[in-house]
UniProtKB/Swiss-Prot annotation:
Gene encoding the protein: yabQ
Protein name: Spore protein YabQ
Keywords annotated in UniProt: Membrane, Sporulation, Transmembrane, Transmembrane helix
Induction behaviour: Expression is sigma E-dependent and negatively regulated by spo0A.
Range of residues in the leader sequence: none
Transmembrane segments: 7-27, 40-60, 66-86, 90-110, 116-136, 141-161
Function: Required for sporulation. Plays an important role in cortex and coat formation.
Subcellular localization: Forespore outer membrane
Organism, scientific name: Bacillus subtilis (strain 168)
Length: 211
């Protein structure tokens, strides 16, 4: 190994020492050890050191073809010590500012999307539902009114027929009148049941529309 290669190796490993110090502070800032489960923290630590080891070996492979020397560890310690004494405070301040800036930008765009996209969609859907319920209620009321008018018209038109039918029934024998009365009572009971069902459905729909 030539002196030039050794010099580049020392320089690269010192830089990697600076990188290691900054990486440790970044890792500690993002991973809150007191609030993280032990098994998850163990996995994080293992992955962190594996990534650091692979990165160190990659740099060393490009600088001196992956040869290990004692001075390499000394250069790494020198880089870490330099970071701790000169760069740590500045780096942490810059890192916290960048995190604050990223979070602020994220919150801004989140609120912007909520106000510009989501709320108008919610308001539009609410207006459509209200309009559909209003139209359904008015249509239901109109149909009920028309059916009531039709019922009254039919009753008025059928009044002569009913009157004639009653008079004809009076002329029939008693047994036949009783038979007709039973059939009429059964029909009236059936109609009452259907009427109660229609009233129940109408009440349910009216309560739903009033909400």
């Amino acid at each position: 190994m030539t002196l030039t290669t050794q010099f580049y190796t020392m320089l690269a490993m010192s830089g990697m020492g600076l990188w290691l110090g900054a990486s440790l502070d970044t890792y500690r800032l993002f991973v809150i050890r007191a609030k993280t489960a032990r098994w998850l923290l163990f996995i994080h630590d293992i992955l962190f050191w594996i990534m650091q080891g692979l990165l160190f070996f990659y740099v060393l492979l490009h600088v001196n073809e992956g040869e290990f020397r004692i001075y390499i560890f000394l250069a790494v310690l020198l880089g870490v010590a330099t970071y701790q004494s000169l760069c740590k405070r500045i780096y942490i301040k810059i890192l916290k500012f960048v995190i604050y800036l990223v979070v602020s930008v994220y919150q801004f765009f989140k609120k912007l999307i909520q106000h510009v996209l989501f709320r108008p969609i919610v308001w539009t859907c609410g207006a459509i539902i209200w309009l559909a319920a209003f139209l359904f209620k008015k249509t239901y009321s109109l149909i009920g009114f028309l059916l009531l008018c039709l019922y009254k018209i039919v009753m008025v038109l059928c009044f002569p027929i009913r009157f004639i039918a009653k008079q004809c029934l009076k002329l029939l024998p008693v047994k036949m009148r009783l038979t007709f009365r039973r059939y009429f009572e059964k029909g009236a009971g059936f109609l009452k049941k259907k009427k109660k069902l229609l009233i129940t459905i109408r009440t349910t729909i009216t309560r739903f529309l009033k909400r």
